[in-house]
């Protein structure tokens, strides 16, 4: 899926994608891994990978107007973080299929939202993506650093948290089905968002998109993924 606009040459847009998608998560991973009480990869990797995939996928898709660019960049970022984690001695025994499936579904879901921002707001779409990423990242980091500080219903509304929990359970060796509700929510909202983008500028598909988001949030709330012990 592509917009009618050419790929933006805006340096701030691509710098922001690199900042949220690569620099901040990489620094966080190194800092957390080198701490006096380094947490397991399942605890660190979930929020870090979710932030990286969201920042790279959503902002890149919004900046370029190309869904595939967002997906490709997000997956490259995810692979890079796993390689970095391995170099730091954290990534022993990562389940490849479950982790890869969670990363792929999350990458597509984030990139579809970015592509919709590009289609609806044209060359300003990446600004919307930045604000969305910043807001979800703030809640994601708070939830990871202080478990229980935020209500479960709020976390159930966040696609970033869906990605976090699906990646956490995969890295923890629990398999994809353990976070089935989160994966279904990511895939379902991606499909609904893709429908809105495909039918733009018609506005009625937004009703389907928001209804799908609320319904799938309820699914995640009532059927949460099993917790992975520890905090950042």
Residue ranges and their predicted role:
Residues 1-10:
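Short, Lys/Arg-rich, polar N-terminal cytosolic tail immediately upstream
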Residues 11-29, 173-226:
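Alpha-helical transmembrane segments of multi-pass membrane transporters/translocases
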Residues 19-35, 39-59:
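Long, hydrophobic alpha-helical segments
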Residues 33-44, 63-66, 87-98, 120, ...:
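Membrane-helix interface and helix-disruption motif detector
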Residues 59-123, 194-198:
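Alpha-helical transmembrane segments and their short interhelical loops
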Residues 73-77, 126-137, 157, 206-216:
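Central hydrophobic cores of alpha-helical transmembrane segments
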Residues 124-154, 221-223:
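Transmembrane helix segments
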Residues 140-199, 227-231:
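Membrane-interfacial helix-loop-helix junctions in multi-pass membrane proteins
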């Amino acid at each position: 899926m592509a917009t009618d606009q050419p790929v933006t040459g805006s340096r701030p847009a691509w710098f922001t994608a690199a900042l949220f998608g690569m620099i901040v998560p990489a620094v966080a991973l190194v800092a957390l891994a080198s701490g006096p009480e380094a947490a397991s990869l399942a605890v660190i990797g979930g929020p870090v990978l979710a932030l990286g995939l969201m920042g790279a996928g959503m902002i890149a898709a919004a900046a370029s107007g190309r869904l595939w660019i967002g997906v490709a960049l997000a997956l490259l970022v995810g692979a890079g973080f796993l390689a970095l984690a391995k170099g730091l001695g954290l990534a022993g025994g990562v389940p490849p299929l479950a982790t890869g499936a969670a990363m792929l579904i999350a990458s597509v879901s984030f990139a579809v939202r970015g592509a919709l921002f590009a289609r609806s707001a044209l060359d300003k779409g990446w600004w919307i993506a930045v604000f969305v990423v910043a807001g979800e990242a703030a809640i994601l980091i708070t939830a990871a650093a202080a478990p229980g500080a935020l209500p479960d219903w709020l976390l159930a509304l966040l696609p970033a948290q869906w990605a976090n929990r699906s990646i956490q359970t995969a890295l923890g060796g629990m398999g994809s089905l353990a976070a089935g509700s989160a994966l279904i929510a990511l895939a379902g909202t991606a499909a609904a968002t893709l429908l809105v983008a495909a039918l733009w500028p018609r506005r009625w598909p937004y009703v389907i998109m928001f209804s799908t988001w609320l319904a799938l949030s309820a699914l995640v709330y009532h059927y949460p993924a099993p917790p992975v012990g520890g905090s950042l």
